[in-house]
């Protein structure tokens, strides 16, 4: 037992918490010192700390005690709030690059301001990442009032800001932004044609508010910037019609993964419908892909759960938060499949121009930290993926919330009747009640049931998210009845109205257990903030999604015994807990699988983006063009080897190709290469093309040539990178079938992606050299014009001669 206690003491989270407590004690010892300083003296003290960090090689951890004590006093003078000890502890955990788990109402927002100030002393930029623009704007406004007292600037990044205003926001010491807009700005920054047009100056330090939501829940959906492609309206409609005609014997859905596939009968039907001999043949891969998308859209996705339709548009709903994912759409044709299903306008399928996952994006930061009320259940994932230790921060006051045992019902219908009865009972006492639902459909079902029962209430879901803050703020007042999807678990405190504490505080009623215990804990966490009273309870049925998908057989047996009976069952609670852990493991594997694949693409993306920046910043491109020329010449000459003797060159074909493709204007005589060995011909070709490029520079002048060449290179890189992404996504889709050949799909993917990448680099080199060689100089333009005019005159003379003869 003594050994166990010792190991527990030295665990990373306990070690970090122990140090944070020591730091907090030291910070508290500075209280009187800073209280006795004037505002101007505090400002000067802050500047001294900046000098220590930026000029004298002190780290932020070296100065964090003085810095935290100083900003604590500044906050007090601005707001009247004196940061709690637990907020100092949380701020230190964040500064250490770890994950501070702080319960709802413990002051995460202020904790972030404290940590952001200390990190801002480095003058390299701090990004505070929030889940929506309302929170970003609210928190930025509050932070601005505090940090301007110590000379720190605060910016807020929005979706609709001009490029100039975005640059200004990111040039501030602290920038508040949403995770999606930040990710998209990063991708857009790597599509600019001038380095000065970039918005983000550096990915130095990010503090992610609601870190579990951003870094885990949203990690399964990559950020994608798309460009228009071909429109195959007719094929989408045909596939949709085909999928809707399938019988239960012609397709199947795996209940755990929710993956749909065709049975043997379905495959035969597809081949007959679309007149194909073999649906799995390479030439039919696009059709097969569209059928799989159609199956997912029609047989798996449900409106109100995965997406909603508003004003003729399909909008994705975040499964975990219930919020609409603004600006996001399904990729690789799935969006079009859903549009066909819902009979709305089918937009042209887009090609992926740039993409990144949140896992890959946030790992680009020099330092990353996060704050949330619920993270401990995913502590292994945060450590493995993001190298962050989850450290639970003690509450400022003891938590006295009552978490009652679940009530289990045989069917959803009986459960909903019981939910309404429970709401009515609580509402008659005037006690506020917050009801959490798993999706939009359930929230609207309950809304209709409460209308029938004449119980006044508010509904918060993705369809009316604009009133989120207003609805959640009032949810703690007397007589309030609030129905919400998982949205209510984030961002805005529910403060108790007068007299509510005496009633027992806020009553939180969950109507279904979520896939993750963490999401359940978020809902529970809405009650009993800062030592308030509160109570939580879940009503669940054996027909709920979690049971149906992951414990189907056990439930079938239980339903036959249970019938309509209702009881609090330790057996079902244990089964539920085991099921949730199993689902969490499955979801972790899904995200881990995503990052394993994305890691391959991430290394290529990083290389391309670094090369891109190098070209944008270079004042001399000659060395880089020489490297491209080296790649190009070998491949170019390879096409013209002598077929009978590979060591010789086909001198006539090579000379013709140079004159035609490299704009040599028939100056290359085939005799130049006659009887040359292949290697000598390669050297000769390199010299000829290099001279051609050098002549371009001399005629155009270096500044003009630099800009023209740079534009050619960047345009070519972007074009071929887009094509590469398309090839990689198609490869990834098809590579899963390799598992049937007893080979690792990931290993095949790594090998073939590497081949695709090298081919892409070769294509870029070829494209760039050919375009530069064919770049028209003023002299060449005049020569071409003279040739064209001469040809016109010749044609006119011939026409006159013909006319005279007639």
From Swiss-Prot:
Binding positions (ATP): 87, 105-109, 493
PROSITE patterns in the cross-refs: SECA, SECA_MOTOR_DEAD
Membrane-crossing residue ranges in chain numbering: none
Coiled coil region boundaries: none
Keyword annotations: ATP-binding, Cell membrane, Cytoplasm, Membrane, Nucleotide-binding, Protein transport, Translocase, Translocation, Transport
Record-stated family: Belongs to the SecA family.
Quaternary data: Monomer and homodimer. Part of the essential Sec protein translocation apparatus which comprises SecA, SecYEG and auxiliary proteins SecDF. Other proteins may also be involved.
Protein name as catalogued: Protein translocase subunit SecA
Gene: secA
């Amino acid at each position: 037992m003594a050994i166990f206690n010792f190991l527990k003491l030295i665990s990373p989270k306990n070690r970090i918490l122990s140090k944070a407590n020591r730091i907090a004690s030291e910070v508290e010892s500075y209280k009187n010192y800073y209280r006795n300083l004037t505002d101007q003296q505090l400002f000067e003290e802050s500047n001294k700390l900046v000098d220590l960090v930026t000029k004298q090689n002190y780290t932020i951890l070296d100065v964090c005690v003085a810095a935290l004590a100083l900003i604590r006093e500044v906050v007090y003078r601005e707001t009247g709030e004196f940061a709690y000890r637990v907020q100092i502890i949380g701020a230190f955990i964040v500064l250490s690059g770890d994950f501070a788990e702080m319960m709802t109402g413990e002051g995460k927002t202020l904790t972030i301001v404290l940590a952001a100030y200390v990190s801002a002393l480095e003058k390299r930029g701090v990004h505070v990442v929030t889940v929506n623009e309302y929170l970003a704007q609210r928190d930025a406004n509050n932070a601005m009032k505090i940090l301007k007292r110590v000379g720190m600037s605060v910016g807020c990044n929005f979706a609709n800001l001009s490029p100039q205003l975005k640059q200004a926001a990111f040039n501030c010491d602290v920038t508040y932004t949403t995770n999606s807009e930040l990710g998209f700005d990063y991708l857009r920054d790597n599509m600019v044609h001038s380095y000065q047009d970039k918005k983000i100056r550096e990915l130095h330090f990010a503090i992610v508010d609601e870190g579990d939501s951003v870094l885990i829940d949203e990690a399964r959906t990559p950020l994608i910037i798309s460009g228009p492609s071909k429109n195959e309206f007719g094929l989408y409609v045909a596939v949709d019609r085909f999928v809707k005609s399938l019988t239960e014997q012609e397709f199947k859905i795996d209940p755990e993964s929710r993956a749909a596939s065709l049975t043997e009968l379905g495959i035969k039907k597809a081949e007959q419908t679309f007149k194909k001999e073999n649906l799995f043949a390479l030439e039919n891969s696009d059709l097969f892909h569209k059928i799989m998308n159609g199956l997912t859209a029609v047989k798996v996705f449900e409106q109100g759960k995965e997406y909603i339709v508003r004003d003729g548009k399909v909008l994705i709903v975040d499964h975990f938060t219930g919020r609409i994912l603004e600006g996001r759409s399904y990729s690789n044709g799935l969006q079009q499949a859903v549009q066909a299903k819902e009979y709305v306008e089918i937009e042209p399928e887009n090609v992926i121009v740039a993409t990144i996952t949140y896992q890959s994006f946030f790992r680009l930061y020099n330092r990353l930290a996060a704050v949330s009320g619920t993270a401990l259940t995913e502590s292994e994932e945060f450590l493995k993926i993001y190298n962050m230790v989850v450290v639970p921060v003690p509450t400022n006051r003891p938590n006295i919330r009552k978490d009652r045992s679940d009530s289990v019902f045989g069917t959803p219908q009986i459960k909903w009747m019981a939910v309404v009865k429970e709401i009515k009972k609580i509402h008659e006492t005037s006690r506020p009640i917050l009801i959490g639902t798993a999706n939009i459909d359930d929230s609207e079902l309950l809304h209709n049931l409460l209308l029938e029962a004449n119980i006044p209430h508010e509904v918060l879901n993705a369809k009316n998210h604009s009133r989120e803050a207003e609805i959640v703020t009032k949810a703690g007042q007397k007589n309030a009845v609030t129905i919400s999807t998982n949205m209510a678990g984030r961002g805005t405190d529910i403060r108790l109205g007068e007299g509510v504490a005496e009633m027992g505080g806020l009553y939180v009623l969950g109507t279904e257990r979520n896939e993750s215990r963490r999401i359940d804990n978020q809902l529970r966490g809405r009650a009993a903030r800062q030592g308030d009273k509160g109570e939580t309870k879940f009503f669940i049925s054996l027909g709920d999604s979690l049971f149906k998908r992951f414990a189907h057989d056990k439930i079938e047996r239980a339903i036959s015994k249970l019938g309509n009976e209702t009881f609090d069952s330790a057996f079902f609670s244990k089964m539920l807990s085991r099921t949730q852990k199993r689902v969490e493991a499955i979801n972790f594997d899904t995200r881990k699988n995503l990052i394993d694949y994305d890691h391959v693409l991430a290394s290529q993306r990083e290389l391309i983006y670094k090369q891109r920046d190098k070209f944008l910043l270079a004042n001399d491109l000659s060395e880089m063009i020489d490297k491209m020329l080296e790649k190009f010449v070998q491949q170019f000459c390879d096409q013209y080897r002598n077929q009978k003797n590979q060591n010789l060159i086909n001198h006539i074909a090579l000379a013709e190709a140079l004159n035609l493709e490299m704009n040599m204007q028939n100056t290359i005589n085939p005799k130049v290469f006659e009887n040359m060995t292949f290697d000598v011909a390669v050297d000769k070709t390199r010299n000829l093309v290099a001279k051609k490029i050098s002549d371009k520079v001399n005629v155009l002048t270096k500044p003009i040539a630099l800009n023209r060449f740079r534009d050619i290179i960047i345009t070519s890189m972007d074009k071929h990178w887009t094509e590469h992404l398309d090839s990689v996504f198609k490869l990834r889709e098809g590579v899963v079938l390799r598992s049937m050949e007893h080979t690792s799909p990931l290993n095949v993917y790594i090998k073939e992606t590497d081949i695709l990448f090298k081919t892409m680099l070769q294509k870029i080199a070829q494209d760039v050299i050919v375009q530069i060689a064919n770049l028209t100089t003023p002299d060449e333009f005049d020569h071409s014009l003279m040739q064209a005019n001469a040809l016109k005159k010749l044609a006119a003379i011939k026409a006159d001669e013909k006319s005279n003869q007639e």
